[in-house]
């Protein structure tokens, strides 16, 4: 009898773990689909902008017209945090903020140059230093900086890196053999942005999402009974345990005295380098409660 109970318990333990993994695998696909849909929307917006005949004419001598068009674009797509229009020499003609930077050698500028050189739309996820994007002490720079939690008393350490989706669309002169005469660059910064996390949790009950750079959470809606803000906290597990085959890691972690099962997946940039992590998790008791009822039901049948 004891052997049967133990074997049944072992079976249900394995079932729980398998269900957890399968659930999170499916959930991860919904997150990545949402992210890809956002990038595709940015791409389509860039293509419409670049294909506008008025924009085409304004590229030569009407910066005011470009600035007005860019402001309209921002109003329609208010999640865009960094937008520039550049000429064929990769010089700024209009930008979404007076505090926006576009220095030589920056990742964004290099990607824009490549897009114009090959005449192809570029879409990728990148991690870029905030000093390449905005002037220090600007609202944008401060808003996207992540204060690292649980430091020594008096310490004020920040993460000054941004995870963002970037789209570059070449602008062509329709009256001159379709030559590339510039580009529009659109970026959506994920730091301190709960759009994907909130959307995810609406679709997946009792489940949470977080993005992290260098092991620091930059956006998160993780909640426990005692804590509701985990932005700036460190991911407690070792990223070196990732499975290289599928570039992800499944495991359990103690989140503020609450055990969560989680699935982490690496995010790669245009150079196919791992730059960040997207992680999803759910309190283990949410799974355990469901399967525990099945376990009790089976034992009940045996003793009838």
Identify what each model region corresponds to.
Residues 86-94, 215-218:
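Short, glycine-anchored, charge-dense loop/turn motifs used at functional sites
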Residues 167, 181-190, 261-288:
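Short, hydrophobic beta-strand elements of compact beta-sandwich sensory domains
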